[in-house]
From Swiss-Prot:
EC numbers, comma separated: 2.4.2.-
Gene Ontology molecular functions: arabinosyltransferase activity
Organism classification: Bacteria, Bacillati, Actinomycetota, Actinomycetes, Mycobacteriales
Name of the molecule in the record: Probable arabinosyltransferase C
Keyword Acyltransferase carried by entry: no
Enzyme class (EC, first level): transferase
Further details from the record: This is one of the targets of the anti-tuberculosis drug ethambutol [(S,S')-2,2'-(ethylenediimino)di-1-butanol; EMB]. EMB is a first-line drug used to treat tuberculosis. EMB inhibits the transfer of arabinogalactan into the cell wall.
Membrane found in the keyword field: yes
A Pfam family assignment: Arabino_trans_C
Location(s) in or outside the cell: Cell membrane
Membrane topology qualifier: Multi-pass membrane protein
Amino acid sequence: MTGPHAAGGSNHRTARLVAIIAGLLGTLMAIATPLLPVEQTTAELNWPQNGVWQSVDAPLIGYVATDLTVTVPCQAAAGLVGPENRNRSVLLSTVPKQAPKAIDRGLLIERINNDLTVIVRNTPVVSAPLEQVLSPDCRYLTFTAHADKVTGEFVGLTQGPDDDDPGEAVRGERSGYDFRPQIVGVFTDLSGPAPEGLQLSATIDTRYSTSPTLLKLLAMIVGVAMTVIALGALHVLDCADGRRHKRFLPSRWWSMTPLDGLVSAMLVWWHFVGANTADDGYILTMARVSEHAGYMANYYRWFGTPESPFGWYYDLLALWAHVSTASVWMRFPTLLMGLACWWVISREVIPRLGAAAKHSRAAAWTAAGLFLAFWLPLNNGLRPEPIIALGILLTWCSVERGVATSRLLPVAVAIIIGALTLFSGPTGIAAVGALLVAIGPLKTIVAAHVSRFGYWALLAPIAAAGTVTIFLIFRDQTLAAELQASSFKSAVGPSLAWFDEHIRYSRLFTTSPDGSVARRFAVLTLLLALAVSIAMTLRKGRIPGTALGPSRRIIGITIISFLAMMFTPTKWTHQFGVFAGLAGCLGALAAVAVTTTAMKSRRNRTVFGAAVLFVTALSFATVNGWWYVSNFGVPWSNSFPEFKFGFTTMLLGLSVLALLVAAWFHFSGRDVSPDRPQRRWQRLLVAPLAVATWALVIFEVVSLTLGMINQYPAWSVGRSNLNALTGKTCGLANDVLVEQNANAGMLTPIGEPAGQALGAVTSLGFGPNGIPSDVSADPVMEQPGTDNFADSDSGVVTGTEVGTEGGTTAAAGINGSRARLPYGLNPATTPVLGSWRSGTQQPAVLRSAWYRLPDRDQAGPLLVVSAAGRFDQGEVEVQWATDEQAAANEPGGSITFGDVGAAPAWRNLRAPLSSIPPEATQIRLVASDDDLAPQHWIALTPPRIPELRTLQEVVGSSDPVMLDWLVGLAFPCQRPFDHRYGVVEVPKWRILPDRFGAEANSPVMDYLGGGPLGITELLLRPSSVPTYLKDDWYRDWGSLQRLTPWYPDAQPARLDLGTATRSGWWSPAPLRLS
């Protein structure tokens, strides 16, 4: 046979063969990729360096080395003997001896009394008297550490007759536990040339510092190419039906309606003024550091293990950060995703739901309102929920296109999109629903074509499409590495089980940002829309006027997604953001379900309206709270919203009233709607869900806009984002003011010595040592939802800033006080008086001498007093006067201080200098303590006007900084400390969030979780630096710490690098849990 038909048959036979071969090759290449070899960069720490006793810093991100070998000549211990060396005790250690818990975590070879002892993780391994160690018989001390055991031996020494094994080598071994010591460097108390034979060698765990070999790279290239070819062949087979190709985008895709404009305006404005999500700083820091590290490590937890298989979305953010790290730029892809979601909902989803949805304005407005109700509070950050929400929609649309055209290529594309969505983040598991609903259509379409092309030609390209994501996940990692990382994360935690899903909903009903008005309303209204859609479908077989298949698949995807979310390892409410796209779709279905056409009963529609009111009332029974800096200035951020009456009470009353109306419709026989045109207000009442969702959306947008207005000229998220458009992209760093030297701003007393001026007029009951020895801040009880964390390093976390917990000193200060002062205040020039006493308390009054105010044009904006104790605001005040008033001892007025800090610890009371009249030239402190409770007392230092510089000027953009994960997005110009080849850069500063944020979220980064705090607490000594938020002086924005090494002279260690080829199953050693 000749002609077009013969040619077409030949093409299809060729396409069938290509589909089979290319599809199978693509699948095989994908399956083989995780097992193919990679090129590993190896790293060893060898010490001593430069031939001298010199401490070096080498903090390992994985805490321990793969293996460790130490050899020390016995004669090296001579540097620890003799009166001239009494301050030297450590021959060699992997942690600074001064650090808290150093002996619990590290290796120390040290002199204890007259013995040289090897201690690892608080366990002695081997010990020998120093006189024997220094004898000619002793040659070397050796120590080795592996995952299964550690051993130590004094080579040349034998046990004496009184020991357990006379004549045997002096040797010790510990096993049955992973005793490998934590390494943050190599430290010694000795100096001078290193003796011959001294050697420490640690193999650093760089199993994740890998790149693909040429073989693996070629396999991935071939695999992707074969997949593309297979899908092309599948398209040729699809076209065998002879039908014309349908246009890819709907005809009205690029058109614009007023509703589109409104949704777009809301998203764009929210992009600037809206609240961010809690993990934005976490993700931004990971992305910023990943380029230098060579892989996307989980920076704040899990010992530097990679984010794979969920890291590809973060890799895109890392590329995006090359342009700018400013919030408004980094979140721009999220804005595009939001717009794309709405375009897909309005142009692809709603028309597919049937004629009733397509032509219903109520459906469109409800879809838009419920979509925004989800997107605004949950998806305005860097978390993967936005791309997951979009991916779910695109997967569903591709499936529906395949069903509508009876073609397999759209289904294959749906599988690719679904797989990418699935691995874009842990919450991508919600995309399982969108993939599962493709099974039915896939079977139907395959059955229609199998008789002509066979199963292999149809399913091989589908298999290649389903596995192509493997290339992305394992492009530079091995199967063994990722399996170990995944199981290790589960062991470290948090790793909550499916039956712990109630924790997520429990948090939804807390009075916190996790259970805020916006989040609670979004989830509850989605559940309500889902319930009414299911009920109507079950009662009538379908929602009248909607397409049966698409509407059922949307409902099915949503139900499956809720079930799939049970298997996420953490249970946070921000993870509900994956439902943003589905919420819009369900909103449209629910709106159609309660129209007068579908639900003719006025009683039932009124009951639905009552349910909407009740859900809204329940949503307002919490705070209008937002995470961290997004909360600044927002109305009702720490209280239930109210105006005259509580919103929740008013809405509950309206809900009850609606139920009474429904009962009247039922009992009066007026249940059926009259058949006449509806007025506009009646049409609004028929769409209560649209009214409620838009009311909440407006409430949210107005709240955050008012927050920006209320804060101005002080810092706010909105002001910062708008400033970024003018090139001011450093966020909070330009508004946090730092007091580098608290001694420099002390005011000069008039007519009194500095040591006596503080209590010169009256100091009844106040004394230099009237301060308890421990003034640590009150502990904060465990917060709701801490079940999301694994065990933390300490059971109770306090809000005490470092150095503000008090204590005593050996030497007395200028006025005889032995109290340890905070913030670097010099006791030789700074007096202190307190009203506390041991035993029975007594009333106390303090009135200081007058202090001279500097010229206003030369003075800073703040008046500050460092204080400790528990007292009310009015009990400490500053009185001001002119020179004449001060001479007559008649103050012109007084002001009180803002108390920002954690009682009873030391903190800085502050008052804006502008609150003191410009004619005032002198001030004095007045305090009264009439409360005789032992816990009620006051301690004060003299007033000062700090010399302030911005945090950006002090910290800059070059110093390595430990940015707590909550603050990363607010400080985009500060450089997070890097890590590379398994070794962490030593940070010089730490920036923390406010007290609540620091207490609640520091456990994420602690030692037990494998975070950076487990490193810095061993290597560095923190000290708090006073800070203030410009024009928002009474705000607890967070805090700044200066990090000082325990060994200031230690140098960064030099690593010996190499390369090695590793198979996909290779593993150097078990990862060690803390």
